[in-house]
């Protein structure tokens, strides 16, 4: 008879959602400690219908990597908002109306999950990443919370290194 209260056969250490680092290229000036939360990569595969008579069969179609949301805290100095808006200006400049070249604004970002001792146990490389949405948040006289910035990042592809 099976013992339903049996403990797990192998002790393990789970990955924790509060042990992660998002690394941006040093040329952007976006420090790792600015990040307060981030989503892990997610992918979507389209299903393609193949109709035949009264039935349908499905096969996998194109796949896409979903956009990633990252939240930053915004200290006075060094300013996260200034670093992010400088990267945004490589995409589009609101003063002159000029648009940037993809080679200039697309960057490779690294997302790392850590074990309890700080060793990287999961690493993603987000290739060709750029900003699609940048929200500097709300201000409120009735609130003493830390100012945050919401950013949506779109990437060409994600590679899980390990």
Residue ranges and their predicted role:
Residues 1-162:
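Glycine-rich, low-complexity intrinsically disordered segments
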């Amino acid at each position: 008879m099976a013992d339903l209260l049996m403990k797990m056969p192998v002790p393990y250490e789970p990955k924790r959602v509060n042990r992660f680092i998002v690394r941006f290229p040093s040329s952007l000036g976006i420090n790792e400690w600015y990040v307060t939360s981030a989503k892990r990569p997610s992918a979507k595969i389209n299903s393609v219908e193949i109709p035949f008579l009264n039935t349908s069969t499905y096969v996998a179609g194109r796949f896409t990597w979903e956009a990633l949301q990252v939240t930053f805290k915004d200290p006075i100095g060094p300013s996260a908002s200034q670093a992010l808006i400088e990267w945004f200006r490589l995409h589009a400049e609101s003063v002159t109306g000029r648009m940037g070249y993809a080679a200039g604004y697309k960057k490779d970002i690294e997302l790392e999950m850590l074990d309890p001792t700080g060793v990287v146990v999961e690493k993603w490389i987000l290739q060709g990443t750029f900003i699609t949405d940048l929200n500097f948040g709300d201000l409120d006289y009735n609130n003493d919370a830390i100012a945050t910035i919401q950013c949506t990042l779109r990437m060409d592809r994600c590679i899980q290194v390990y």
